Amino acid sequence: ASPAGQQMVCTTTELNPDDEVALGEWLADEAIHKALHDAKMAAHCLAGRDWHIGGVCCDTLVASYLILPGQRNFNFTDVVERHMGVTLESADKGQLTLVDVAENNDRYWESLAERAVYVLLLATQLAHDLEDYGETRLFHEMEMPLVMVLQRMEHDGIAVSPRALHDLEKDFAEQAALMEREAHESIGDDTVNIGSPKQLQTVLFDQLGMSKTKKTKTGHSTNAESLEKLYVKYGHPFLAAVLGYRAAMKLKTTVTGLINAVGDDERIHTTFNQTITTTGRLSSTDPNLQNIPVRTDDGK
């Protein structure tokens, strides 16, 4: 959609070679300012056709987040309703099939055109709101440049060695097995499942007679904090072994998740979330690279 009131909706399958080149040049032109909702995702989609998008002056997703960071949902229809008081009909309301789209369903295309118009209207509204909140400079000088930096980071990925990850997985599995054996030896019973909170309660509070921890729905707490307090109080080797087992298993699980996330290019392509936390920091998902425990030497 253009500020002049023109809209165009098309599928790339309808473009002839000349049109495709022209569209690619228009998308890449930094002098032509563009507003999008979720520019990072759009850039990923366009990159699949070797297109680059330049001149993005407003990402309404990011702008809405800066104004109301505590919201749980920033999809386009919710953002339009939140900031403009307009309820848009979903483009796929009525569960349109690919056949409907292929048959040029007018309602579907009109809905997409309407949404394109509202991207521009929303961008204008959010520009005023950013000014009112004193966040215009933050938006243009930090958040908007960061959008495409994150897109490139996600696209390029993080190079890893699958062999090294498999070696780590094996090492942590062996550490966990060793800790499990030490736990069994310390109480003279190799039938106890130290991964079972219920069986841990029986060993700690009934068999070893330790003071009971905080009451829970399933008995008494056996979380890490509770076990560490018991270890400080009693110093029993069973507790040390259980804590060591848990630490090793957590690292093994983390490494297994990383192995599963490695792509054919031997890189991990995580998603960096710019609009999730209320504090403004980045988060990472699929996989969560911020969930790697680094407080211990093994974690590091």
Where are these regions (language model features)?
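Conserved "right-hand" nucleotidyltransferase catalytic core of DNA-directed polymerases
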Residues: 1-14, 71, 98-299
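Conserved DEDDh/DEDDy metal-dependent 3′-5′ exonuclease domain
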Residues: 1-131, 169
